Amino acid sequence: SAPSSAGPAVSHDSPDIPDSPDPQLTLARGDQPEIDLEIKRSHFLARAQRADCEEEARAFIAAVRSRYPDARHPCSAYIVPSPGAPPIERSSDDGEPSGTAGQPMLETLRSSGLTATAVVVTRYFGGTLLGTGGLVRAYSEATTRVLAAAKRVRLTTRYLWEAQIPVADAGRVEAELRAASERGAHDLSVEDTTWGATHAVLALTTDSPDATRITEILAAITAGGAAPRSAGHRVVELPA
């Protein structure tokens, strides 16, 4: 018999459908939406999860398969990034008639604009045959609903910088940087301040890898007494 329903899906506005997957639009890390779609007594249990690579997508599919070991058809689809190449797209009908499950799921996932995302739809047969068209509609609808229940985020790269400031000036410099950022004068954020005996190191982030603008900002505040040093970058999640 089918497991109990996962409960009502949480509704989120759907974004405009782009011509191709947005490489920055995905699911929030840790979000695992789940829905139960019942059609003619068959249950289609859909789950989705962030997957940044094929290994993560396959591990998620295996975990869902283990969760429902008595299910007949855990069908799947995923789109994951491939550095320097087009995204990797895979789907599986897992025993359903060819083209009735995995491919419709993949097409639905593709049209959502999401990437780095895996979906598994597990069917528990209710005794009534749905036919080829019915299966296509059911797997497509289950995928649509679970993606609608997901928390979407847009990934953006923040570039890290450090600036060494004399202790006597560090408090003022930090305050001026924060105030200017709050006014929208620049996108430079103060993430942390490490205090030493004679100097403090400000950990800063910005949207640009170019040091020109941040150098100008620091020069104006410190009378040319501080220059930024690159400290790498990180990817952060912003609400989509």
Segments predicted by a language model, with ranges:
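Generic non-transmembrane alpha-helical segments
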Residues: 67, 108, 120, 173-180, ...
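C-terminal regulatory domains involved in ligand/effector binding and gene-expression control
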Residues: 1-99, 193, 208-211, 216, ...
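Short beta-strand-to-loop capping motifs
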Residues: 49-52, 163-167, 203-208
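Short, flexible, solvent-exposed loop/turn segments with mixed acidic/basic and small polar residues
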Residues: 34-39, 149-154, 187-195
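Active-site beta-strand/loop microenvironment that shapes enzyme catalytic pockets
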Residues: 101-149
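Non-DNA-binding regulatory cores of transcription-related proteins
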Residues: 11-12, 177, 187-212
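Short glycine-/aliphatic-rich beta-strand segments at the starts of folded cytosolic domains
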Residues: 153-169
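Short amphipathic alpha-helix segments
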Residues: 165-190, 213-215
